[in-house]
């Protein structure tokens, strides 16, 4: 066989193999992943991984890759992981020919920080399976490409594989990312697992493979907003009050779910969060994201109820199964005001959901030795979990699905009574998604979403200055209660000690707020007040994700099953010159259940960046508001009408004429029955 690669490539892995790294004790490791490969598939997976390796080392590395595939279900290329701790260093410590190339390296390494990543050695940032890329060969090669990237080139990355550098121009994206995009017939978990094991598909979740994760802070503000608005809408709490004296119960203290306790505390509630993995509880307790920890149901309940009675906030981490907790609370007649779940139910059979009666360690062992038996136990626990929620609902508890596919997992396990129509999931479920009931109408329909930024200097003073600038802007543009909530959030953000990893901030803002803050920050960079900044957002946004069980669950015109909004948003951000953009399959809710995209935008203080911001920031938000308006969402229609007036002669969004329901029903009865 003729190998043309060596002479034809100048950007490649080093010829000499790195020394096999040491694995530090005390860090979580991913369980064995499911794949069900044939012998031919296994050979293909090894052959695929060897594409990154010089032929002189194929015999040695083929054996290592085969061992990894057997033990872990995936080829991670552990030998190629850099020795020691990875973290997002100050931007000046990175090599690169353009600022974007260096900035993106900061964000990649931040995703793999031991203090942030769920399974750092397996490149999993959060969400049980959300990876930066598939393996450490890809990581090293991406870094090499970013070091060579110029401001007239674009790096293309497909499911973690750096396809190459291609000539573009200064106003084009520097990196274009896609993760796990599959042809429809094969777009399911089984086929994805095979593709991932073969080394051709990466599950990027949202900001894991999109290189924009900022630690659990990234979801705290959204969870805070959700809890606060749930209290207003469902418990009758006035807009100027918080959740003092209320009890919130949920499950999960991982990369995203870890925000629950902190958000509940900031919102003033007493809370109990169940988590089976004690190491995750340890992480959140050390970081100050939960205030108490215990393996005793009695103690957890007493702490929470004592705080609730005094109207004081608390976040109690209960080390145990959520179903055990619910049984105990129910049998002891404890009233729960708000209830949810943030276990990784987008992959319930891959370790995302732990069956009742198993410890976390037993769960991991059973996944490896008896995956079929594990599946049976998961289904049994899901059924019981659902039964307990129904019992609490009868007592007046408000339960909402937090978009983790919990209700879909219950349905997939064989429970049809969870469906609104009693048969299938086309009309949704009897319990609402938090987007359907709360976040959609209260925030997304207005354009409010999870805007974020990272100070690339890693200097806390830069973050403080941007916090103050944001607070000043919002205070001067206080139009409705959402603005006041956001003002209080950013005003107190530093006090609430939210930073884990690089100096980043999450702040819900609407289209104009995002654009104006972005322009202000770029001006501050230009004036030398702060160092470079990178902007982004969660894919979980008004226009970033099409997901009928979550982000688009409050779209009621039938288009909730369409994936065109997220795709158009991604393409539009590319056309307008965002620094890097990403489009993924299955973020949050699982493969085949979502198409989601995001971006990163580097602020270097230039007028070029100002131009891009003025074009891209309104688009990135308003594409979602426009779609929601066309679905006849009232708040979105109001927002679009205001936008059309504001941008008259520049932008114009189509709005719906409203038809009378009675007329449509009458015509159907008269002419179509």
Protein language model regions, located:
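Long, compositionally biased, glycine/small-hydrophobic-enriched stretches that function as flexible linkers
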Residues: 1-216, 371-520, 524-536, 542-546, ...
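Residue-level detector of anion-binding/catalytic polar loops
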Residues: 270, 335, 398
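Glycine-rich, charged/polar anion/phosphate-binding loops
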Residues: 323-326, 385-386, 517-521, 565-568
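Catalytic or ion-translocation cores adjacent to nucleophile or general acid/base/metal-coordination motifs
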Residues: 205-228, 232, 239, 244-247, ...
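Short, solvent-exposed amphipathic alpha-helical segments in soluble enzyme
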Residues: 265-267, 330-334, 415-419, 525, ...
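Active-site/ligand-binding-proximal alpha/beta "capping" segment
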Residues: 315-343, 350
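Small-residue-enriched alpha-helical segments and adjacent helix-cap loops
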Residues: 538-568
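Glycine-rich beta-alpha junction loops
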Residues: 278, 320-323, 342-347, 403-409, ...
């Amino acid at each position: 066989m003729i190998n043309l690669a060596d002479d034809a490539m100048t950007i490649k892995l080093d010829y000499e193999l790195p020394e096999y790294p040491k694995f530090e004790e005390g860090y979580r490791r991913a369980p064995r992943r499911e794949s069900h490969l044939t012998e031919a598939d296994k050979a293909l997976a090894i052959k695929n991984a060897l594409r990154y390796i010089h032929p002189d080392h194929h015999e040695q590395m083929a054996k290592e890759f085969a061992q990894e595939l057997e033990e872990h279900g995936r080829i991670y290329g552990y030998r190629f992981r850099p020795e020691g701790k990875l973290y997002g260093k100050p931007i000046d410590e990175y090599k690169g020919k353009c600022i974007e190339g260096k900035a993106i390296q900061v964000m990649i390494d931040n995703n793999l920080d031991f203090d942030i990543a769920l399974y750092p050695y397996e490149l999993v940032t959060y969400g049980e399976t959300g990876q930066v890329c598939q393996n450490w060969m890809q990581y090293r090669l991406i870094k090499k490409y970013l070091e060579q990237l110029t401001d007239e080139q674009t790096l293309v990355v497909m499911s973690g594989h750096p396809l190459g550098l291609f000539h573009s121009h200064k106003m084009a994206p520097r990196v274009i990312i896609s993760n796990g995009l599959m042809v429809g017939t094969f777009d399911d978990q089984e086929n994805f697992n095979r593709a991932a094991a073969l080394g051709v598909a990466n599950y990027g979740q949202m900001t894991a493979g999109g290189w924009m994760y900022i630690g659990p802070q990234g979801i705290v503000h959204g969870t805070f907003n959700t809890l606060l608005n749930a209290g207003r809408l469902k418990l009758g709490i006035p807009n100027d009050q918080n959740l003092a004296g209320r009890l919130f119960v949920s499950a999960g203290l991982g990369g995203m779910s870890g925000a629950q306790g902190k958000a509940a505390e900031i919102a003033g509630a007493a809370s109990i969060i169940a988590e089976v993995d004690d190491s995750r509880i340890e992480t959140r307790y050390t970081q100050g994201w939960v205030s108490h920890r215990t393996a005793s149901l009695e103690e957890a309940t007493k702490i929470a109820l004592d705080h609730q009675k005094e109207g004081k906030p608390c976040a109690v981490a209960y080390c145990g199964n959520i179903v055990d907790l619910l049984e105990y609370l129910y049998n002891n007649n404890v009233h729960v005001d708000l209830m949810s779940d943030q276990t990784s139910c987008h992959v319930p059979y891959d370790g995302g959901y732990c069956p009742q009666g198993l410890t976390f360690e037993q769960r991991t062992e059973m996944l490896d030795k008896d995956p079929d038996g594990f599946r049976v136990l998961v289904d049994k626990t899901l059924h019981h979990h659902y039964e307990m929620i129904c019992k609490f609902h009868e007592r007046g508890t408000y339960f909402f699905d937090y978009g983790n596919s919990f209700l879909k997992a219950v349905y997939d396990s064989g429970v049809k009574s969870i469906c609104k129509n009693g048969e299938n999931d086309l009309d949704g479920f009897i319990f609402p998604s938090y987007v359907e009931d709360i976040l959609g109408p209260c925030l997304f329909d207005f354009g409010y979403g999870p805007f974020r930024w990272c100070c690339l200097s890693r200097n806390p003073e830069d973050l403080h200055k941007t916090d103050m600038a944001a607070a000043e802007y919002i205070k001067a543009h206080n139009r409705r209660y959402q603005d006041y909530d956001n003002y209080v959030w950013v005003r107190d953000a530093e006090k609430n000690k939210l930073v884990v990893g690089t100096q980043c901030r999450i702040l819900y803002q609407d289209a104009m707020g995002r654009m104006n803050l972005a322009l202000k920050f770029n001006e501050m960079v230009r004036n030398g007040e702060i160092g470079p900044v990178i902007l982004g957002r969660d894919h979980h946004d008004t226009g970033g994700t099409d997901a009928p069980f979550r982000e688009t669950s409050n779209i009621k015109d039938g288009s909730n099953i369409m994936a065109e909004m997220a795709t158009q948003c991604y393409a539009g951000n590319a056309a307008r010159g965002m620094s890097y953009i990403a489009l993924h399959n299955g973020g949050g809710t699982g493969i085949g259940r979502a198409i989601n995209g995001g971006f990163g935008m580097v602020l270097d203080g230039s007028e070029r960046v100002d131009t891009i911001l003025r074009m891209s920031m309104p688009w990135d938000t308003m594409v979602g508001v426009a779609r929601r308006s066309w679905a006849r969402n009232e708040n979105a229609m109001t927002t679009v009408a205001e936008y059309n007036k504001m941008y008259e002669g520049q932008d114009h969004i189509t709005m719906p004429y409203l038809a009378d329901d009675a007329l449509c029903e009458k015509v159907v009865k008269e002419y179509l029955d």
